[in-house]
Amino acid sequence: MIDEALQFQSRRAGAVQPGKVMLVGAGPGAPDLLTVRASRILSQARLLLYDHLVSPGILQLAPPGAELICVGKESSRHTLPQAAIIELMVSLARSGKSLVRLKGGDPYIFGRGGEEAQGLAAAGIAFEVVPGISAAQGAAASAGIPLTHRDHATSVVFATGHMREDGRGDGRTGCRGDLDWSLLARPRQTAVIYMGLGTLPRVCTQLIAHGLAADTPAAIIERATCPGQRTIVGDLRSLPALAALHDVHSPALVMIGSVVSLHAQLGVRAADAFAPVAAIDGVAAGMSVRLSGSQSVTTITPFISGCGPQL
């Protein structure tokens, strides 16, 4: 009763009640991979701030009349700097507006959700974090590459590859210092590299230098779970050249480890679940290349000595 009376008195005095911010994970890309809670919140949103990684199909789930604001956060350019995004959310909430902050994957896995939650907490703004299926989980399922497997990997590690060439990290990820290469190069482990396309040659070189075999299976999954998904499979030695050859673009994840070899068996079935194309054979850079998949899902597997089955 006391709380209700105080709220009533505040309204009488003309005080604006701050709005609430929902930090919502949009999942790996496909709209039907949203959680039930995320779908419900999105369907009721009146004001939505989203990153460039959120797929158009998900944005279409917002109700008619909802205000959608792209705040960017692409690696090559930012529509708004991170500090400005937090300031905008705080300002909108203080003006009495509740809003949805929609982020690709899960907000707390390389989504800067933790920083945004800290900013809201420091400003006294009420917020809620709604988890999402991570990009790594979506990529693993849609590419047919399990993150763990008793015969291949007893651990999995997520890392960001978005760093400066001098290894000192960068302002976007807040990464201070180089990656722990010894940790990433452990045997019987799956390493998933987020935002790693720009530094892929360095990542592969460092992993080999720290003990992983050059023929360790590795893959890039581009646009996981979405139309146009591509899975490029090679090894640590060949993957950077394959990424350049096939003009791979973000959003994409890099997966490294023995589990990648299971793609040859599980990839087609995984592709069928997400989408169904005739195999195309070709030759590129001296390697036999097979493109296969289903509907809009394409697999590019180079057949080189010590990497993958000879099909």
Give residue ranges: language-model regions.
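Short hydrophobic/aromatic-enriched beta-strand-loop microsegments
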Residues: 66-73, 124-128, 147-157, 211-220
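Short secondary-structure boundary/hinge segments and terminal tails
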Residues: 59-60, 79, 110, 138-139, ...
